Amino acid sequence: AFAGVLADADIKAALAGCAAADSFNYKTFFKACGLSPEEVKKFFAIIDQDHSGFIEEEELKLFLQTFSAGARALSDAETKVALVKA
């Protein structure tokens, strides 16, 4: 979804930075990817799988897999924190 927008090295670095359980911070992740605020908006439209205009908990849980199919799912705690702070 982000081919040509993000460098593979940036994606790998961002994923490595949150590989450990309960280490995900969405601001740090987007910064590591080099996403601009406009690109972040586009990204959220992509992970809104049901096109409801909202990011549901289950969609957010699989957030990292949008960047790499082998990435881990977010924990319940990480998902809840991201929903509250986003």
From Swiss-Prot:
UniProt keyword annotations, A-Z: Acetylation, Allergen, Calcium, Metal-binding, Muscle protein
Modified residues (N-acetylalanine): 1
Record's function text: In muscle, parvalbumin is thought to be involved in relaxation after contraction. It binds two calcium ions.
UniProt GO MF annotations: calcium ion binding
Coiled coil ranges: none
Note: Is regarded as an important allergen. On the 2D-gel the determined pI of this protein is: 4.09, its MW is: 11.35 kDa.
Family the UniProt entry places it in: Belongs to the parvalbumin family.
InterPro entries: EF-hand-dom_pair (IPR011992), EF_Hand_1_Ca_BS (IPR018247), EF_hand_dom (IPR002048), Parvalbumin (IPR008080)
Superkingdom, taxonomy of origin: Eukaryota
A GO term from the CC aspect: cytoplasm
Protein name as annotated: Parvalbumin beta 3
Matching PROSITE patterns: EF_HAND_1, EF_HAND_2
Statement: the UniProt record of this protein carries the keyword Acetylation: yes
